[in-house]
Amino acid sequence: MDYRHPNALGVNESSRAYEEIFGAPRKREPARTVSTPAFMEPAPVSKKPLPPPTRRLPRKPLPFRSTSLQPPSSQPPAPPTHQREASPVKNIEHSESFPSVFGTSNNHQIVPLTLKDGNDFGALYASLNTTPHFPQVSNHAPNNSNSPSLTWHTSSGDDSNQNPFFVRRQSQSSTSPVSDSVDENLLSAVSSVTESVETNLHLDQNYPYGSPVRSSKNPFLSSNSRLPTDDSSHTVGSHSFTSGTHPPIVSSNSAFTLPNAVTPAAQAPLIRSVSEYPANVSPPAQSLQLPKSTSNPADLHLSIASASSHKNIFSGLDVFSNVFHGPSTTLRDREHDMRNRSFDHSTLAHYEAVKQQRLGVEPTARSFTLSSYKSRASGNSLINDRSSTTTPTFVNSEASSPVHKNKRRRRIYAALLSRVASELLDRLQLGDITKDGLIYSNAFTGDHAVTVLMGIIHTSDRNLALLVGRSLDAQKFIHDVTYDHRLRDSHREIYQLQGTGYRPFLRANDNASINNKNHHKELEDNESGTRISPSTLGDTSFPNGIFTLLTHCYSPTCAKDHPCYSISCPRRLEQQHRLFAKMRANTEQSSSLAFDDKEQKLWIHSVPQEIAYSVSDRERKRQEVICEVIYTERDFVKDLEYLRDYWIKPLWASSCIPERKKEKFIRTVFLNALEVQAVNSKLAEALTKRQNYKPIVDNIADIFLEHVPKFEPFIRYGAGQLYGKYEFEKEKSSNPAFAKFVSDVERLKESRKLELNGYLTKPTTRLARYPLLLEAVLKYTDEGNPDKQDIPKVINIVRGFLSRLNVESGKAENKFNLFHLNQQLVFKPGEHYDLHLLDANRQLIFKGPLKKRSAGSTSSESASDVTLFLFDHALLIVKPKTINKRELLKVFQRPIPLLLLQLFLVDDNGLRIPYSSKQQLAAVSKAANGKPPSRFYPFSLQLLGRRGYEITLYATTEVSRDKWLEHIDNQQTLLQHRNQWFESVTICSNFFVGDNKVNAIGVYDSGRRLLYGTDTGVYVSLRKANSPLQFKPVRALNIPNISQLEVIEEYSLLLLLSDKVLYSYPLEMIDADTTQAPKKARKVSGHTTFFRVGICLGKVLVCAVKSSVLSATIKVFEPVTNYSKTRNMPSLKKFLTVNQDPLRIVKELYIPTESTSVHFLKNKLCVGCTRGFEVVSLDNLETQSLLDPADTSLEFVEKKENVKPIAIYRMNGGEFLLCYSQFAFYVNRDGWRSRPTWFVVWEGSPQNFALSYPYILAFEPTFIEIRHVETSELIHVISGRNIRLLADGRGKLGDGGEIFYACDQRGENCETSVVCSLRLTSAAAHAKEQHVDK
């Protein structure tokens, strides 16, 4: 089926419309062929004359045309002419080889002007008379009477309503007068040009690329017109179209006037003839010129200008139709010459639709602009700047407009309210706005909404944009936060979108790719603002309707000056004025009604006149404010009674809501509104009594002081209002019976055309109005009045309630938003992370859109959109998705706990810089100065641990990136201070540098002395308790590569492990003079992997482990008793005793698997090996597994590969805490799992553990993970580089009992080992003491 434009008329329809409008049938003549080419000398050509018309009916006058313009009766009727369909044109060119389609005679020459739009879409023909001429003769015309010249001039008259187009014939040799008759076809064509250019083709000086600017009165107008043909002379403005030999007629009272609908800022070129340029200056390449013949060169110059009062010019030609006149005119069949064909409206629409479909754009109205041309005003016309070399070019506005090129804002049909609402949803900037002491989230101001609507409908008229906004308001798409009035163009009025309260997270186009170029701008405007989405309950419900003031006219015969037959044609300015007048009348009527209603409530009208004028002006104003306080209080109570009588009670009696949830629904939606009504009804009654007691009310503060302290129900009501609104909307959308009930009640006259949400917000807004009203009363209160001291007290009490209301409603809103966010989250298959979003203290700190580049990509165009949520405990990265018409948030990566997060700045070279302060941020920003601005600003997030990852995100502005870093850093600092149960105290720093790393530590002498085992030997230093002083260590032993060190102070023995050899050394020799100390330590055991010291069977035992992949040998040593008494021995006996072996071997065990740890139980040893924990008896050396194989809940341990048992701790109640390299759990003394719900998966890969009840510390190279042993909650994380445990603080062999660790820090030239001690804070120690007492 052929394409048909919806506005196009069929053949029969077009003929009937033509006959109805112009009073004569439309005639079509067959095309005739001619042989005379265009722009040649007149030559006798044989042609077949046109047959006479078979029917000639009197034509009705044109609409709004003056009767004085009809042809005089004395003038013979002109032969009929014919007009074909209008064609859009763009470029104006001459074709030397273009044949004329007219026959020529002695008095006529046909000059075609081909106007093209990339395709050959028609021609403009002008008839030239070779004998007559105007009195004005071009000075540049050649002295040849047979050289015709066609010039389009502008009259120099002062009439502001001029049509700038007319044709004059010039000749130097002829002086014949010019006929006053005007060819009607040419008049129709020029009129069509006028209205088309005037309507669609305006150049705004603010658009440097020639972007079209629509008229503010009629933004969308059809460019097609059909006018009748006649030979009568007509005058357009002060311009005359002439043919024949009569003088021209110049009239300023013509009905063909130029409407004032052209943008005043428009500019237009003036195209001069070749002869007007100096000899040394070449004309523009595309100036209109007649092609020069061999003997008779002709000049053709066309001037385009407009009335001087408007300074409007026409920037292009949109639609021309073929114009024919003269008795010898013949038609040429378009099949014979495809370059000179003209199409009807439907054919052109078809070509345009096909072209736009190929380009992949939505079919739109076609318009053309004259771009890249500069002009200046001179007198009554715009004179072209001769210095400019830019030539006028008619180009398509869709191609030349910078808006179209960048596609930052799509153009929509502004008459469709659904399109306007969708665009408004995308462009609005939402945020938290405070009004009357109340904070409204996801709100916007009225003037902002009007400004956005102006950009959407492309108008500079704020009143028109306000009308469109009120059309959306009428369908409840937007509403005032207090539901008091409609949309107003004011920054003081606050509004919200429908359902914004429970749709706070997504935006309608959040899932758009960065390839959508308008998305980049939106991100720049909304980096930190709240973004909304369609309702999570279903599809977005946009308003439906047509805003008739912005609609197009669908009649193809409609023109600017001649509106079509429809009474609702948008071109009828009179109708628009009537509509606006009606609206103004309605507004004035409604405002007058409101004024009358207000007059009845004024104090001056409620008391006798003599009393009203007996008081001073100040007191009169005070009484007016007091009267307003009293009657508004009564109105507030009536509103609450309306809720009770028309909503609550009918709902209890109705069956529209199921009985099982009716009570819960009513309590959730209406909350304690009846409690508020009970409190305020007593207040209103007391105020009314005071008012009735005396016409002049002396004071009211004492009444408020009595009732305001009872405003506690307002707090509970405000906290649950958001949930009530959500339940109401949810029930209304899912329950048709309830929806009908709501509709019926809201239509009652008692509702005053206000929906239920407007009444539900009354209590909170009323509480916020009390301070404003009372401050107004206080303003006009004299000093001696008791209200002068009492009113401030009342205001302070009310503001205290307002502060509590804001806090509670903020908590409720945060909890509500987290609840819906938790419902929207979607995890990858097989993954689920419990973010504890429903916890009572959980908070959403910050949220916003960011960019993420795909792996391996360096182009910013390949970035994708993600949304980042910052909670009080974690970061969440999601991708918005729409699945089954439901907005969901797909979790992009594993949530990052803030305790395990590391922030990095990324410089221009891609290097990561750890973020720790604002100074570093300032340094990076300073380094970026002087370089071209970047499109995106990156920062990097790193998750520590075994399952960690790193991701780089990009903000669109530097301010946005800095804000993200600031929020994350502040929340991390707050969280660390809140959960800092351990404090890290530096013991030694800036001493062990380079390769001399600290690997072990020993404490003795009640913690006053420390021994450091390093790669170069053993160092000793002093230490003062609870003192930040650091003492310089001194080398005591020159034994290299010490990996383990233990001090057995009871036996005055030091054990060292160096290069897998276990040594012993007398402890007292460390304190002696280095000259008396023995040179070498005593060897205890070789090929030792590690050793452990502990208490078993009531004895101090030393276990030296020699481990390999297939087996492990454990030697059990016991210190010699006499060795510990050498301190008090005489020197000789002491010397002999020292030479004895300090350790004697007790047992030697063999285990057929690799061993990783040894632990001491009460009577047995527990060895950690690849098979798990094995219990070994020292009596009979029997070995058995600690875990009972009968417990099937422990099968995961046996099936898990590459899991190492590292530590075991005895807990209260006979339980054991087993710590592996990946997880931890509890078992009882029988080897069965004791706490099924307690299970810890370590974030990192721990290598050592330490217990400081009630906390377990897991040490891995990059951080220390601290968890609570009862709740398994992650309490604290201490990060560092190359962290290693030095002493776990277990037992009381040494008096220290502290936990020591070492880490590396980067110095100026090398790395330094820093030794730290972990201690419980005072609060944690106090909590631990209380737990022990229990």
From Swiss-Prot:
<dbReference type="InterPro" id="IPR035899">
    <property type="entry name" value="DBL_dom_sf"/>
</dbReference>
<feature type="modified residue" description="Phosphoserine">
    <location>
        <position position="381"/>
    </location>
</feature>
<dbReference type="InterPro" id="IPR052233">
    <property type="entry name" value="Rho-type_GEFs"/>
</dbReference>
<feature type="domain" description="PH">
    <location>
        <begin position="843"/>
        <end position="973"/>
    </location>
</feature>
<feature type="domain" description="DH">
    <location>
        <begin position="621"/>
        <end position="808"/>
    </location>
</feature>
<dbReference type="Pfam" id="PF00780">
    <property type="entry name" value="CNH"/>
</dbReference>
<dbReference type="InterPro" id="IPR000219">
    <property type="entry name" value="DH_dom"/>
</dbReference>
<feature type="compositionally biased region" description="Polar residues">
    <location>
        <begin position="150"/>
        <end position="164"/>
    </location>
</feature>
<keyword id="KW-0963">Cytoplasm</keyword>
<dbReference type="InterPro" id="IPR001849">
    <property type="entry name" value="PH_domain"/>
</dbReference>
<dbReference type="GO" id="GO:0000917">
    <property type="term" value="P:division septum assembly"/>
</dbReference>
<keyword id="KW-0717">Septation</keyword>
<dbReference type="GO" id="GO:0005737">
    <property type="term" value="C:cytoplasm"/>
</dbReference>
<keyword id="KW-0597">Phosphoprotein</keyword>
<dbReference type="GO" id="GO:0009272">
    <property type="term" value="P:fungal-type cell wall biogenesis"/>
</dbReference>
<feature type="compositionally biased region" description="Polar residues">
    <location>
        <begin position="381"/>
        <end position="400"/>
    </location>
</feature>
<keyword id="KW-0344">Guanine-nucleotide releasing factor</keyword>
<keyword id="KW-0131">Cell cycle</keyword>
<dbReference type="GO" id="GO:0032153">
    <property type="term" value="C:cell division site"/>
</dbReference>
<dbReference type="GO" id="GO:0051286">
    <property type="term" value="C:cell tip"/>
</dbReference>
<dbReference type="Pfam" id="PF00610">
    <property type="entry name" value="DEP"/>
</dbReference>
<dbReference type="GO" id="GO:0140472">
    <property type="term" value="C:cell cortex of non-growing cell tip"/>
</dbReference>
<feature type="compositionally biased region" description="Low complexity">
    <location>
        <begin position="138"/>
        <end position="149"/>
    </location>
</feature>
<dbReference type="GO" id="GO:1903139">
    <property type="term" value="P:positive regulation of cell integrity MAPK cascade"/>
</dbReference>
<dbReference type="GO" id="GO:0051285">
    <property type="term" value="C:cell cortex of cell tip"/>
</dbReference>
<dbReference type="GO" id="GO:0000935">
    <property type="term" value="C:division septum"/>
</dbReference>
<dbReference type="InterPro" id="IPR036390">
    <property type="entry name" value="WH_DNA-bd_sf"/>
</dbReference>
<dbReference type="Pfam" id="PF00621">
    <property type="entry name" value="RhoGEF"/>
</dbReference>
<feature type="compositionally biased region" description="Polar residues">
    <location>
        <begin position="213"/>
        <end position="227"/>
    </location>
</feature>
<dbReference type="GO" id="GO:0007264">
    <property type="term" value="P:small GTPase-mediated signal transduction"/>
</dbReference>
<feature type="compositionally biased region" description="Polar residues">
    <location>
        <begin position="234"/>
        <end position="245"/>
    </location>
</feature>
<comment type="function">
    <text>Stimulates the exchange of Rho1 and Rho5 GDP-bound form into GTP-bound form. Controls septum formation, cell wall synthesis and localization of F-actin patches. Coordinates actin deposition with cell wall biosynthesis during bipolar growth.</text>
</comment>
<dbReference type="GO" id="GO:1902716">
    <property type="term" value="C:cell cortex of growing cell tip"/>
</dbReference>
<dbReference type="GO" id="GO:0030866">
    <property type="term" value="P:cortical actin cytoskeleton organization"/>
</dbReference>
<dbReference type="InterPro" id="IPR041675">
    <property type="entry name" value="PH_5"/>
</dbReference>
<dbReference type="InterPro" id="IPR000591">
    <property type="entry name" value="DEP_dom"/>
</dbReference>
<dbReference type="GO" id="GO:0070273">
    <property type="term" value="F:phosphatidylinositol-4-phosphate binding"/>
</dbReference>
<dbReference type="GO" id="GO:0005634">
    <property type="term" value="C:nucleus"/>
</dbReference>
<dbReference type="GO" id="GO:1903338">
    <property type="term" value="P:regulation of cell wall organization or biogenesis"/>
</dbReference>
<keyword id="KW-0132">Cell division</keyword>
<dbReference type="GO" id="GO:0005085">
    <property type="term" value="F:guanyl-nucleotide exchange factor activity"/>
</dbReference>
<dbReference type="GO" id="GO:0090334">
    <property type="term" value="P:regulation of cell wall (1-&gt;3)-beta-D-glucan biosynthetic process"/>
</dbReference>
